[in-house]
Amino acid sequence: LLWLSEQQGVFNFLRRNSLARRFASRFVAGETSETATAAALDLKRLGITTSLDLLGESVTRDAEAIGARDEYLRMLDRLAASGAEINVSVKLTQMGFDIDEALCVDNMRRILTKARELGGFVRLDMEGSAYTQRTLDFFERHLLAEFSKHTGVVIQSCLRRSADDVTRLIGMGARVRLCKGAYLESPEVAFPDKQDVDRQYVALMEQ
């Protein structure tokens, strides 16, 4: 589930555009972290697992990355206090990955330390294919050993490389979540045919 929080440009567009608002309502749990938490709690009562994701990526300033980090820290506390599942998904570019890797490491470690204290889980979202290897390297180098019980990574079944990635991650004992992928990629990198994406999704799931 997504929540909008302080992503003001996106927030204003969705508020003004009724078509965009109807489309987004399928995926956006709430306009604030409070409403997103309530949605997550409702789904937990139905036996449905959730992971909350703050809408936004590719920040360009340290302050934006730190602000997103602090919003995640507040969300983890809010989820714990509410009784909802303590599970969030984070994009590295939102944590300053393209600004300064040390900043990104610090932000992610703070989020994961909080999640570990609360018995929660942090999923590393996968972005476009230009970030796939960098994200996996970051996950292995900075997070997996210390936070293995509280973190995992996403793999996209649309990418041709994903079978090898899943095999390697399983060998490391990493927790993998599969998705089909929503980024526009070249046919050299990703399967252009949905049937191939679906077929690989099933094959990866069975590994």
Report each predicted region and the residues it spans:
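Positively charged, amphipathic and often flexible ligand-engagement surfaces
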Residues: 1-207
